[in-house]
Amino acid sequence: MKTDVLLKDLAAVFRWTARLNMHEGIANHFSIKLDQEDNNNNNNSFYINRPGQHFSKMKASDLLLVNENDIDMLRDRPDIIDPTAVNIHGTIHSKVKDANCILHCHSKYATILSTFADMTLPPIDQNTMRYFNRITYYDDF
């Protein structure tokens, strides 16, 4: 899929997330890894939202390209991008090759789940079965 289409789709995901009222807090970020053909086969470049941009107003042109070579510099520039976003998304995109799109938000239910000692979501009923084998846990962060 071409980069411009991916960016428009990701911007729509931001707006839909706001519509669903799942944009609580300021430290939420979504990213999309570039298609290798559009990225000179560089697997670790991705687009991500800038800090402070309201999800309901997101446009494709608001998304910031993070190149693998820029990650160290961007970690020291919170005015450009949230350093936690660079760390989280950069690490996941480089370690989990199938993670082409990462949606990191602090929804009420995910926040509650994160307070438990065991933060995994066991497939114990119909509601949780929809996530069975569809969630990746990265325990070394």
Feature-to-residue mapping (PLM):
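Glycine-rich flexible loops
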Residues: 1-141
